[in-house]
């Protein structure tokens, strides 16, 4: 919400559906207007949302969409930008195929904060699916401008022979990842499968203990034959 306020977007919240930890998709569809530009689903506790349903909704509402920049025009509908802060490593079942969650929405953001499954102490990552008419390098450079005061070169490229000169082309933010943080993340990646396995073992113990109490919990494990949920990452037990 804070980042949206910084760019003066107008926000509209969609509540969760009854007896669910996902948004009310009917309310989502009803909330889309001619002014809607982006939907930000939240993968709470590492469990992916029903992205097939979300994409069906934005396709049905396509006639209402009025793009305001070149990327929006290229995508041609409301953008789906997933908040996957909890879901690094989660996967999603689509047409019988397992897709990693960073390749489901148009854009996907991950958090590597200290309390997440994979941590670099602070920081995160962002992924996107190919956008017709836009080179990935161009999209990457736009994010680099946003993350380093609008500078046209990052620290690595400034250090090259004769590469000291750069421009500041926009008033942007300072949220680039340091080499030290990246090094921590690389080690975490090597350990990640084992970390997820350990979390699964712990959650199985919780499930066994809570089952007789009749408590409603997030479906940390699900039938892989279900349409949209495959394998969550389980950073939280709710």
What is each stretch, according to the model?
Residues 86-88, 103-152, 179-182:
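Active-site PLP attachment segment
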Residues 29, 53-56, 93-100, 123-125:
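Short, glycine/charged-enriched secondary-structure capping and boundary segments
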Residues 33-36, 119, 233:
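Ser/Thr-centric signal marking residues that sit
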Residues 23, 51, 90-94, 121, ...:
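Short, function-defining helix-loop hinge/capping sites that tune catalysis or transport
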Residues 1-89:
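PLP-dependent aminotransferase-like
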């Amino acid at each position: 919400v804070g980042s949206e306020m910084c760019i003066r977007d107008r926000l509209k919240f969609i509540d969760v559906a009854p007896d669910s930890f996902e948004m009310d998709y009917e309310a989502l569809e009803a909330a889309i207007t001619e002014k809607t530009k982006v939907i930000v689903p939240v993968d709470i506790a590492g469990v992916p949302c029903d992205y097939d349903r979300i994409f069906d909704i934005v396709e049905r509402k396509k006639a209402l969409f009025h793009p305001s920049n070149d990327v929006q025009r290229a995508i041609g509908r409301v953008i789906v930008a997933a908040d996957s802060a909890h879901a690094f490593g989660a996967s999603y079942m689509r047409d019988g195929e397992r897709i990693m969650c960073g390749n489901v929405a148009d854009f996907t953001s991950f958090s590597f904060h200290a309390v997440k499954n994979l941590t670099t102490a602070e920081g995160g990552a962002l992924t996107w699916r190919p956008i017709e008419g836009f080179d990935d390098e161009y999209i990457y450079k736009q994010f680099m401008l946003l993350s380093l005061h609008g500078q046209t070169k990052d620290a690595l490229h400034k250090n090259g022979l004769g590469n000291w000169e750069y421009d500041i082309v926009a008033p942007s933010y300072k949220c680039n990842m340091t080499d030290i943080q990246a090094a921590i993340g690389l080690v975490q990646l090597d350990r990640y499968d084992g970390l997820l396995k350990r979390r699964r073992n712990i959650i199985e113990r919780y499930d066994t203990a809570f089952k007789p109490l009749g408590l409603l919990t997030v479906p940390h494990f699900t039938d892989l034959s279900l349409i949209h949920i495959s394998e969550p990452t389980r950073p939280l037990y709710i």
